[in-house]
Every structure is written in structure tokens, then in C-alpha cells.
From Swiss-Prot:
One of its GO terms (biological process) is amino acid biosynthetic process. GO terms for molecular function: NADP binding; shikimate 3-dehydrogenase (NADP+) activity. Involved in the biosynthesis of the chorismate, which leads to the biosynthesis of aromatic amino acids. Catalyzes the reversible NADPH linked reduction of 3-dehydroshikimate (DHSA) to yield shikimate (SA). NCBIfam families: aroE, PRK00258.3-3. This is Shikimate dehydrogenase (NADP(+)). NADP(+) binds at G127, A128, G129, G130, A131, N151, R152, T153, V154, D155, K156, I219, G242.
């Protein structure tokens, strides 16, 4: 019988997940289908119960349901609980189990371009919202010891640092201070929406004094190269946009559901083509 997977959100028509996952199913000769479900906030509970009753094998969760979904699940993975958001649900033994692959997917993507283990790196996170939280906790979970957080509101950066129970050395910085200190970091990760289309001329941090070999990663993928990435490239940094994070988090969800490993590069090239790259 064909296995059913999907993604729930509102809006959902723009999602590239169905294209990516259905291509992977076809490539691996699997009898499965991935569908995008438009689910409004007021019917989230009914939708989740309906998906469970239909026997869905697993599904992704996107805006605006990543936090609210937690009330309707049977179990939640400890890391997802710590992050406070779920983006992947596995239906196993009659239970819906929630995970967060955003942060771990990002960590895998980052490690794929780093010549040394991330545990040896000093990292600066720009932003203190939901994406930053997922990445911070996931970096801490794999043993990264130095992660500073810069945010427009420094108190919010302090809150994020305080919430993490792992033994991480962290300092909360203003964006102005982070601009001054940028040369002290091996990796800079941009997690805000600043620089996203259509406001492409904006940047949270003016890149001016990076060390050779610094990695600058931006979770935005529209445009492919944000202003911060363009400036970093001019300084000789290695850059990475948000496509890698999107693909790796999707691949991790695919592995959780099926026990199979999809072709990451195939997924990435498909997404780039769909985005017009």
C-alpha cells in the first residue's frame, strides 16, 4: 500500500517540500507520496487527528503551526522540547512523535562545508528568534563550546543563552558590538529575515574585517546571495545560503520516516532549479 507523507501549514502553496520528497521517493523506487495540506490555525487539532486516523506515516510542520502542534502530539523528542518547536512528526506504533530537524539539519549542512569539526569553532549567531534558537540548541547538542549571540535587543539574546542548559560559553552582544568583534569568529550564522526579498539591500551586520577562512552562513535563500553573503565573499569568506539548511532538514526527516538516505546533492540541485537558479 502506498505510504502517505506531507506538510501542513498556512500558506502552503509555495512549499518546495512535495517536489523534493516525491522526487526522492521516485529515485529510490519507493511506493510513497508527499502532499501539501493547507491547514488553518483554528482547525489544527482536527487536522492532526484526521491525519493520524488516515494512517499518515509522517509529516512536516511549517508556519504557523510549529509551536501549536506540540499540544496535539503523543510524544516530543527532548531536543524539540528544549527548542520549543516541532517541524517533523513521525507516526510510529500508533503514536505521533514530534522532532525538530531544522537545527540538526543546519548543523549537518554547516559541517558539510567546514574543513574542521564544528566543536573546534568559535561561532557568532545573528538573531535570537525561533530559527536561532533551533540552531543554538542543536550546535550545543553536538558539543560546540563557544557560541555568542548578537541581536538588536540584547535582552532577547540573553534569554536564549540562559535557556540552554548545555555547557556552552556564550556572550550576548548588540549588533554594533558584533560588527566590531566579527574578526574573532570562525563562523558567522545569519538567522533573521533581514536581507530577504524584497528588502535585499538590508543587512544585520556590515562585513568589513573577517579572517581568512571564515564561514558565513545565511538561512535565507531568496535571494541566493544576500547582502551579508556578498560582502563576506568579497572578503574571501566561504559562504553558504539557506538552501543547504532546507535540503538537509528535509533529508533528515526523510531518514526518520523511511530509514532510507536520499541523495542530498540531487535534492539540492532540484530545489535550486525550482527556485530559478
Amino acid at each position: 500500500m502506498k505510504q502517505l507523507y506531507g506538510v501542513i501549514g498556512n500558506p502552503i502553496g509555495h512549499s518546495l517540500s512535495p517536489v523534493m520528497h516525491n522526487d526522492a521517493f521516485e529515485h529510490l523506487n519507493m511506493d510513497a507520496h508527499y502532499h501539501a495540506f493547507l491547514v488553518k490555525e483554528e482547525v489544527l487539532g482536527e487536522a492532526v487527528r484526521g491525519l493520524k486516523a488516515l494512517g499518515i506515516s509522517g509529516f512536516n510542520v511549517t508556519t504557523p503551526h510549529k509551536v501549536a502542534i506540540m499540544d496535539y502530539l503523543d510524544e516530543i523528542d527532548p531536543l524539540a522540547k528544549q527548542i520549543g518547536a516541532v517541524n517533523t512528526v513521525v507516526h510510529k506504533d500508533g503514536k505521533l512523535i514530534g522532532y525538530n530537524t531544522d537545527g540538526i539539519g543546519f548543523v549537518r549542512a554547516l559541517q558539510s562545508i567546514s574543513s574542521k569539526p564544528l566543536q573546534e569553532k568559535r561561532i557568532l549567531l545573528l538573531g535570537a528568534g525561533g530559527a536561532s534558537r533551533a540552531i543554538y540548541f542543536s550546535l550545543a547538542d553536538v558539543g560546540v563550546k563557544e557560541i555568542d549571540v548578537a541581536n538588536r535587543t540584547v535582552d532577547k539574546a540573553k534569554e536564549l543563552i540562559t535557556a540552554c542548559k548545555a555547557t556552552v560559553h556564550s556572550v550576548a552582544l548588540s549588533l554594533e558590538k558584533a560588527t566590531e568583534e566579527q574578526g574573532n569568529y570562525d563562523i558567522i550564522i545569519q538567522t533573521t529575515t533581514i536581507g530577504m526579498h524584497p528588502r535585499v539591500e538590508h543587512t544585520p551586520l556590515q562585513i568589513s574585517s573577517l579572517n581568512k577562512g571564515t564561514i558565513v552562513s545565511d538561512i535565507i535563500y531568496n535571494p541566493f546571495e544576500t547582502k551579508i553573503l556578498c560582502e563576506a565573499k568579497e572578503q574571501g569568506a566561504m559562504i553558504q545560503n539557506g538552501i543547504d539548511m532546507f535540503v538537509y532538514q528535509g533529508a533528515l526527516a526523510f531518514e526518520m520516516w523511511t530509514g532510507r538516505t536520499p541523495n542530498i546533492e540531487r535534492m539540492k540541485q532540484l530545489v535550486i532549479r525550482k527556485l530559478g537558479g
